[in-house]
Amino acid sequence: MKIIDAHLHIFPSEPGTDAMARGVGHENSVEHLRQVYGELEIVHGVVMGNRSLETGFHNYPRDLFHYCVGLDSLVLDRGRNIPADLPDQVEEHLKRDNCCGVKLYPGYNRIWLSDDCYQPIYDLAARYDKPVAIHMGLTAFSRAHLKYCHPLTLDEVAAD
């Protein structure tokens, strides 16, 4: 049986992230992750891309990872600043073979999934036949707003 890690984040080497990895008996590196994947017979992973819309930021080893371009709170400034060219930037990712979808973070951005700003993103995902993943439920940030990421809010978008 082939195992795929369907949701992971890769963070640059920084004192905080490196210490967190060491605290649970690991190293914060792709090389270490490759080793652990081999030991656990995990054949591939899907990186939930964060922190940037620059395509150059999302250069993961293709034999090991695909990625979803993430529209997180750093990209959308917690919903305060949505770039006018957001659809164009997202499309550049969706054109790439190693990009397998888009990830939305409504609770962190305080943007309803039914907000007009997301419609071009949904349309692009449909055009490129790639899924939209959505961070629903509890968040890792205490100042995120759960009302935006309650599972029932997805119903409005998915059912309509």
For the regions a language model picked out, list residue spans one by one.
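Short, intrinsically disordered, charge-balanced linker/junction segments flanking boundaries
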Residues: 154-160
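Active-site gating/metal-coordination segments in enzymes
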Residues: 52-148
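Short hydrophobic/charged patches on amphipathic alpha-helices used for structural packing
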Residues: 34, 90-91, 155
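An N-terminally biased module of ancient metal coordination in phosphate/nucleic-acid-related enzymes
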Residues: 1-60, 152
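Residue-level detector of solvent-exposed, low-hydrophobicity positions
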Residues: 14-18, 44, 72, 129, ...
